[in-house]
Amino acid sequence: HLLQFGDLIDKIAGRSGFWYYGFYGCYCGLGGRGRPQDATDRCCFVHDCCYGKVTGCDPKKDIYTYSEENGAIVCGGDNPCKKEICECDRDAAICFRDNLDTYDNKYWLFPNKYCKEESEPC
């Protein structure tokens, strides 16, 4: 669920998911096309690809379960599809955290007109 994704970003990367990543580069936020602009935008590209592989549930709407164990997010529940969504979200949040030092404000509110190149395959 997108709100849960935002919560995981807050927990793992320590930043507001919607504010920092909702409108970043060519892939963070709704849609996505072109070439990822930097490592953070690539996190979103990989996240989009991960969602694209999920079948049997809706990554943007379905609610999943997770827990925090020794500082780590552990995806759980009986539904393998929802667990997969959680893993996509967790991995993207970890990617954001790992690339905080290269987050570039010039890609925040990045105009779509600069995202016209052909998208690379997942």
Curated annotation (Swiss-Prot):
<feature type="active site">
    <location>
        <position position="47"/>
    </location>
</feature>
<dbReference type="GO" id="GO:0006644">
    <property type="term" value="P:phospholipid metabolic process"/>
</dbReference>
<keyword id="KW-1015">Disulfide bond</keyword>
<keyword id="KW-0479">Metal-binding</keyword>
<dbReference type="InterPro" id="IPR036444">
    <property type="entry name" value="PLipase_A2_dom_sf"/>
</dbReference>
<keyword id="KW-0964">Secreted</keyword>
<dbReference type="Pfam" id="PF00068">
    <property type="entry name" value="Phospholip_A2_1"/>
</dbReference>
<dbReference type="GO" id="GO:0005543">
    <property type="term" value="F:phospholipid binding"/>
</dbReference>
<feature type="disulfide bond">
    <location>
        <begin position="57"/>
        <end position="81"/>
    </location>
</feature>
<keyword id="KW-0378">Hydrolase</keyword>
<feature type="disulfide bond">
    <location>
        <begin position="28"/>
        <end position="44"/>
    </location>
</feature>
<dbReference type="InterPro" id="IPR016090">
    <property type="entry name" value="PLipase_A2_dom"/>
</dbReference>
<keyword id="KW-0106">Calcium</keyword>
<feature type="binding site">
    <location>
        <position position="29"/>
    </location>
    <ligand>
        <name>Ca(2+)</name>
    </ligand>
</feature>
<feature type="disulfide bond">
    <location>
        <begin position="26"/>
        <end position="115"/>
    </location>
</feature>
<feature type="binding site">
    <location>
        <position position="48"/>
    </location>
    <ligand>
        <name>Ca(2+)</name>
    </ligand>
</feature>
<dbReference type="GO" id="GO:0005509">
    <property type="term" value="F:calcium ion binding"/>
</dbReference>
<feature type="disulfide bond">
    <location>
        <begin position="75"/>
        <end position="86"/>
    </location>
</feature>
<keyword id="KW-0443">Lipid metabolism</keyword>
<comment type="similarity">
    <text>Belongs to the phospholipase A2 family. Group II subfamily. D49 sub-subfamily.</text>
</comment>
<dbReference type="GO" id="GO:0047498">
    <property type="term" value="F:calcium-dependent phospholipase A2 activity"/>
</dbReference>
<keyword id="KW-0442">Lipid degradation</keyword>
<dbReference type="InterPro" id="IPR001211">
    <property type="entry name" value="PLipase_A2"/>
</dbReference>
<feature type="disulfide bond">
    <location>
        <begin position="43"/>
        <end position="95"/>
    </location>
</feature>
<feature type="binding site">
    <location>
        <position position="31"/>
    </location>
    <ligand>
        <name>Ca(2+)</name>
    </ligand>
</feature>
<feature type="active site">
    <location>
        <position position="89"/>
    </location>
</feature>
<feature type="disulfide bond">
    <location>
        <begin position="50"/>
        <end position="88"/>
    </location>
</feature>
<feature type="binding site">
    <location>
        <position position="27"/>
    </location>
    <ligand>
        <name>Ca(2+)</name>
    </ligand>
</feature>
<dbReference type="InterPro" id="IPR033113">
    <property type="entry name" value="PLipase_A2_His_AS"/>
</dbReference>
<dbReference type="InterPro" id="IPR033112">
    <property type="entry name" value="PLipase_A2_Asp_AS"/>
</dbReference>
<feature type="disulfide bond">
    <location>
        <begin position="49"/>
        <end position="122"/>
    </location>
</feature>
<dbReference type="GO" id="GO:0016042">
    <property type="term" value="P:lipid catabolic process"/>
</dbReference>
<comment type="function">
    <text>PLA2 catalyzes the calcium-dependent hydrolysis of the 2-acyl groups in 3-sn-phosphoglycerides.</text>
</comment>
<dbReference type="GO" id="GO:0050482">
    <property type="term" value="P:arachidonate secretion"/>
</dbReference>
<dbReference type="GO" id="GO:0005576">
    <property type="term" value="C:extracellular region"/>
</dbReference>
<dbReference type="GO" id="GO:0042130">
    <property type="term" value="P:negative regulation of T cell proliferation"/>
</dbReference>
<protein>
    <recommendedName>
        <fullName>Acidic phospholipase A2</fullName>
        <ecNumber>3.1.1.4</ecNumber>
    </recommendedName>
</protein>
